[in-house]
Amino acid sequence: MYAVFQSGGKQHRVSEGQVVRLEKLELATGATVEFDSVLMVVNGEDVKIGAPVVAGAKVVAEVVAQGRGEKVKIVKFRRRKHSRKQQGHRQWFTEVKITGIQA
């Protein structure tokens, strides 16, 4: 059984027991979170597709960790001008473990 849900402007395909990195959620480690915007639920041959969401379906998860991703470097280089600008960015994320899918 797996489901596709939406969080942080992105869609994630998950099954029970899977650990997923999402955009930062303001929750403490160990907290339980429910995602109601479930777009699709598949259980063997039974497929439920929402228009736009599946009514009554939700994905339940537990917050495992909060953290920051790998550094992305941004470089602006002006040739022949002896000018260069560098910047770095690390995006915050929340790691959750899927504990249940209800349809």
Swiss-Prot record:
GO terms for molecular function: rRNA binding; structural constituent of ribosome. Pfam families: Ribosomal_L21p. GO terms for cellular component: cytoplasm; ribonucleoprotein complex; ribosome. It comes from the Bacteria. Belongs to the bacterial ribosomal protein bL21 family. One of its GO terms (biological process) is translation. Keywords: Ribonucleoprotein, Ribosomal protein, RNA-binding, rRNA-binding. Part of the 50S ribosomal subunit. Contacts protein L20. InterPro entries: bL21-like (IPR028909), bL21-like_sf (IPR036164), Ribosomal_bL21 (IPR001787), Ribosomal_bL21_CS (IPR018258). Transmembrane segments: none annotated. This protein binds to 23S rRNA in the presence of protein L20. HAMAP family: Ribosomal_bL21 (MF_01363). The gene is rplU. This is Large ribosomal subunit protein bL21. It comes from Haemophilus influenzae (strain PittEE).
